[in-house]
Amino acid sequence: MTTSRRPSPRIRSFVKDLSATIPGAFRFTRGHYSMEELAREAIIRGADRIVVVGERRGNPGIIRVYAVEGPERPDNIVSFIVKGVSLSRERRWGLPSLRGGEVLVARPLDSGVAVEFADAFVIAFHARLKPPEAAGYVEAVIESLDARTVAVTFRYGGAPVGPMLRLGKPAEMVKRGRRV
């Protein structure tokens, strides 16, 4: 998980929150790395996804998820428009103390656009739609706000953790040819 080339302090805090909340994610300081160099770094670290948070007026504006299949330029597979962010420190929530082995579970609260976002979370973050029996998990609770917008709250052990997001659906959220 990384940022655009010259991130604002708020973007850096957001990436820190999000990488601490999503199981298996790690934060990488981008610097002047190109996408190809990010792909090579991901392969070295054993990752198959690169998450890049873009900026809009100093705030998170878009989350792009890329699939890493080799050292060449990664493919953009999922994009989310960020309409609003509330960082964990602003809500006085903590970050989860993940022990390893946890998974991300996407739980839509209603049908329609929340289900579309849950499917996109499965593709982007290897989330599951049902919690596992034995392992711990971080739950991404996805609630529809209107026909194109959802609110995402992360929970660990039933308590809210990490950032709270309002995400919008771009014209093409899941890129062609990608299925759950």
From Swiss-Prot:
Residues 1-178 form the Brix domain. InterPro entries: Brix (IPR007109), Brix_dom_Rbsml_bgen_prot (IPR023548). One of its GO terms (molecular function) is rRNA binding. SUPFAM superfamilies: Class II aaRS ABD-related. The keyword NADP does not apply. It comes from the Archaea. HAMAP family: BriX. This is Probable Brix domain-containing ribosomal biogenesis protein. It comes from Aeropyrum pernix (strain ATCC 700893 / DSM 11879 / JCM 9820 / NBRC 100138 / K1). The lineage of its organism: Archaea, Thermoproteota, Thermoprotei, Desulfurococcales, Desulfurococcaceae.
